[in-house]
Amino acid sequence: MHKSIIAAAIVAAGFSTAAYADAHSITVGVSWSDFQEERWKTDEAAMLGALEAAGAEYLSADAQSSATKQLADVESLITQGVDALIILAQDGASIGPALDAAEAAGIPVIGYDRL
């Protein structure tokens, strides 16, 4: 996984929210379509390392191959107060409402792999 994706999430969160103004660290939420593939586990380790190095927090959710669950997962990440989202969409056509919710909350989204 490219560190530039993580850097983009951190920069987007830092410039689009008051994350620094209210003295809390940036939290990046990652919505995985299905965490069973070995590739995603490797990518997660890279994400964790990059986020930790930047002083950011990491939250994740595994949709378990369910577009419906992924929508609920993203809404949960938004409710938990993430400053940026990285989404590996289970279904590009079904993820729209989650993207709309993130936009309404002012949360930048990085489409990862399939979006």
Could you say what each language-model-derived stretch is?
Residues K3-A13, Y20-L115:
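A residue-level marker of the well-folded mature domains of exported/periplasmic proteins
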